[in-house]
Amino acid sequence: MDLTPREKDKLLIFTAGLVAERRLARGLKLNYPETMAYISAALLEGARDGQTVAELMHYGTTLLSREQVMEGIPEMIPDIQVEATFPDGTKLVTVHQPIA
């Protein structure tokens, strides 16, 4: 299977997102890489499902709460930016204050 570097990056984000999802389901608090992967993967999947940039910007703020991540993580992530592929091309999705 020949994948472009961009496809490899998306696959890595998706895989790390699955690990984070499983840990969250077990009641574990997510660390920084897990938090980034969880939110990024959800945004990429949302774009694939046809959501708009504006919808994803809001959706990204609803995925995790302070109680679901380790102490200090919300302050480490003032925003998340993900390049997602939409039906009309690639766009940058920015989520400000993703963890409320």
Swiss-Prot record:
Tell me which GO cellular component terms the UniProt record holds. Answer: cytoplasm
Pfam families the UniProt entry points to? Urease_gamma
Q: Which residues cross the membrane?
A: none
Molecular function via GO: nickel cation binding; urease activity
Name the enzyme's class. Answer: hydrolase
> What's its catalytic activity?
urea + 2 H2O + H(+) = hydrogencarbonate + 2 NH4(+)
Q: What are the record keywords, sorted?
A: Cytoplasm, Hydrolase
Q: Which CDD domains match?
A: Urease_gamma
Annotated GO biological process: urea catabolic process
Query: Where does this protein act, in terms of pathway?
Result: Nitrogen metabolism; urea degradation; CO(2) and NH(3) from urea (urease route): step 1/1
Disulphide bond pairs:
none
User: What's the protein name?
Assistant: Urease subunit gamma
- Organism from which the protein derives: Pseudomonas fluorescens (strain ATCC BAA-477 / NRRL B-23932 / Pf-5)
